[in-house]
Curated annotation (Swiss-Prot):
Keywords: Magnesium, Manganese, Menaquinone biosynthesis, Metal-binding, Thiamine pyrophosphate, Transferase. The gene is menD. It comes from Staphylococcus aureus (strain JH9). GO terms for biological process: menaquinone biosynthetic process. The keyword Flavoprotein does not apply. NCBIfam families: menD. This is 2-succinyl-5-enolpyruvyl-6-hydroxy-3-cyclohexene-1-carboxylate synthase. CDD domains: TPP_PYR_MenD, TPP_SHCHC_synthase. Its cofactor is Mg(2+); Mn(2+); thiamine diphosphate. It catalyses: isochorismate + 2-oxoglutarate + H(+) = 5-enolpyruvoyl-6-hydroxy-2-succinyl-cyclohex-3-ene-1-carboxylate + CO2. GO terms for molecular function: 2-succinyl-5-enolpyruvyl-6-hydroxy-3-cyclohexene-1-carboxylic-acid synthase activity; magnesium ion binding; manganese ion binding; thiamine pyrophosphate binding. It is an enzyme of class 2 (transferase). Gene3D superfamilies: 3.40.50.970, TPP-binding domain. Pathway: Quinol/quinone metabolism; 1,4-dihydroxy-2-naphthoate biosynthesis; 1,4-dihydroxy-2-naphthoate from chorismate: step 2/7; Quinol/quinone metabolism; menaquinone biosynthesis. It comes from the Bacteria.
């Protein structure tokens, strides 16, 4: 028994130390019995912060938010059985978004697998469709090889925690009873750092000269790291190229004449220009209309992503580069320039007139977009916005026009689950205001527990149209009229004031845009600001804006 405890202690303390060595500073633990050894090891480590969340699904999304906020890998730990399966949505989001989430599932020892033991399911390779690397660790024993396996496996897995190969990894860890390590053996807990991998590549720019020397070019930038924007702006300035900047690109923070923000509304309202080449940077953009245009255009398309697995949506490019945006554009700098002034001025004219139409619209609108416009005005440069999927991110795409605020969202799998938890994870490291719809909020209300337990401050702006507003913009609205409200509108009639009381949030309800205009978003407390809207009215008012922009485009071109 003594040998077992010593072996278990050395294994889990070594494992915790190795995670620290590769940059882990936070672990989110969901309580359970089988995870006892590692939970105690993390709790005992002097330089690892532990978070406790009883719901595995929300815990995993909370960790995703921690990673977004800290830009470091974060580990999650749960007990054996179906607890692990609840991690799946967040792992899928992490895989598509290249988020270094370290998944640690505790397991029954091998002799208790597939024999009917309680809380024992097949956990080996259970996430293999969504993780970059996985390994079923050996059980603790006295052999040197068991400890060496930790060193070897962490070294292999570390390539997926940094650089272009980033993504979630999974370690399944079986533990045999008794489960308590020796908490006095703290000398085994170390805080040494490994040399982390560094990735940088250059390109042969000569292969692109004949393409980039053409006049009508665009730079389209999706979700990407804020550290990569400098060279994009420099290249755009030198070569007179418009930048169509997604709200998650971090480029709308800059008051730069080449940054185009109204493109979604312009394409939605009938814009269709001939283009020679497109440089696509980062993840796919949010705008459905821009993605549809990319699918049909004859322009030569260059894709730049700092990933080992290129996301080609909405269409495969003519050529792609696995390289950072800064390195790519730095490689293209040359002495000669192309005169594209008239091409750039055409886009700048459309942008200026588009902004004017949006401003006039917002001065009179009473729908959700008017609420979103007011929220953007109220958000200070010290704060960041986390935007839920569905309609909120689309309204922000249309209405965020060059303001120095950071915008974040879960745009990997684009799901509505785990939004509250992800935003709260980010709120640990940044001042965050969450913009979310009522169905997305309902889906992750239990995520609010982390705010209550840990005093994490975050304001929530809740757009409540009592259902799924985005479906009003889809063909189902007209083709399935008799069934639409039951199958797609899905009203719930929930009173979210009770949710606020349950999780000790302040609560304010606004029934009109004029009421919200006079409100102050407090930074000292956690408050839910509920904005009551109407789905049908939202749809009708959006159509008015599209028509105004369509007329503007017709008069301009």
């Amino acid at each position: 028994m003594g040998n077992h405890k010593a072996a278990l202690t050395k294994q889990v303390f070594t494992f915790a130390s190795e995670l620290y060595a590769y940059g882990v500073r936070e672990v989110v633990i969901s309580p359970g019995s089988r995870s006892t050894p590692l939970a105690l090891a993390f709790e005992a480590h002097p330089n690892i912060k532990t978070w406790i969340h009883p719901d595995e699904r929300s815990a995993a999304f909370f960790a995703v938010g921690l990673i977004k906020g800290s830009e470091r890998p974060v580990a999650i730990l749960c007990t054996s059985g179906t607890a692990a399966a609840n991690y799946t949505p967040a792992i899928a989001e992490s895989q598509i978004s290249r988020i270094p989430l370290i998944v640690l599932t505790s397991d029954r020892p091998h002799e208790l697998r597939s024999v009917g033991a309680p809380q024992a399911i097949n956990q080996v390779n259970m996430f293999n469709n969504y993780v970059s690397y996985e390994f079923d660790m050996p059980i603790a024993d006295d052999s040197k090889e068991t400890i060496n396996a930790i060193y070897y496996q962490m070294q292999i897995a570390s390539q997926y925690l940094y650089g272009p190969h980033k993504g979630p990894i999974h370690f399944n860890l079986p533990f045999r009873d008794p489960l308590t390590p020796d908490l006095n053996a703290t000398e085994l807990l170390t805080s040494e750092m490994k040399i982390l991998p560094h990735y940088q590549k250059s390109i042969d720019a000569s292969a692109l000269r004949h393409i980039l020397n053409k006049k009508k070019g665009l730079i389209i930038v999706g979700d990407m790291q804020h550290q990569e924007v400098d060279q994009i702006l420099t290249y755009s300035t030198i070569y007179d190229l418009p930048i169509l900047a997604d709200p998650l690109s971090h480029l709308r923070k800059f008051d730069h004449p080449n940054v185009i923000c109204t493109y979604d509304l312009l394409f939605r309202s009938g814009l269709d220009l001939n283009v020679d080449f497109v440089i696509r940077v980062g993840k796919p953009v949010i705008s459905k209309k821009l993605n549809q245009w990319l699918k049909k255009t004859d322009a030569f398309q260059i894709l730049v992503q700092n990933n080992d697995k290129i996301d080609v949506f909405p269409i495969a490019p003519d050529i792609s580069y696995e390289i950072s945006a800064n390195d790519f554009f730095r490689s293209l700098m040359e002495d000669t320039t192309i005169n594209r002034v008239s091409w750039l001025e055409k886009w700048q004219c459309l942008e200026k007139k588009g902004r004017k139409e949006i401003k006039c619209y917002l001065e009179q609108a009473t729908d959700e977009s008017a609420f979103v416009g007011e929220l953007i005005k109220k958000t200070s440069e010290k704060d960041a916005l986390f935007i839920s999927n569905s309609m909120p991110i689309r309204d922000v795409d249309n209405l965020l026009l060059n303001k120095n605020i950071d915008v974040y969202a879960n745009r990997g799998a684009n799901g509505i689950d785990g939004i509250v938890s992800t935003a709260l994870g980010m709120a640990v490291h940044k001042r965050i205001t969450l913009l979310i719809g009522d169905l997305s909020f309902y889906h992750d209300m239990n995520g609010l527990l982390m705010s209550k337990l840990n005093n994490i401050q975050m304001n929530i702006v809740l757009l409540n149209n009592d259902g799924g507003g985005i479906f009003s913009y889809l063909p189902q609205k007209e083709s399935a009229t008799d069934y639409f409200e039951r199958l797609f509108g899905t009203p719930t009639g929930l009173d979210f004031e009770y949710t606020a009381k349950l999780y000790q949030f302040d609560f304010k309800r606004f029934n009109s845009v004029s009421e919200f205009k006079n409100a102050t978003l407090l930074s000292e407390t956690s408050t839910i600001y509920e904005l009551i809207t109407n789905r049908e009215d939202n749809f009708k008012q959006h159509q008015i804006l599209y028509q105004k922009l369509s007329e503007m485009i017709h008069d301009t071109l």
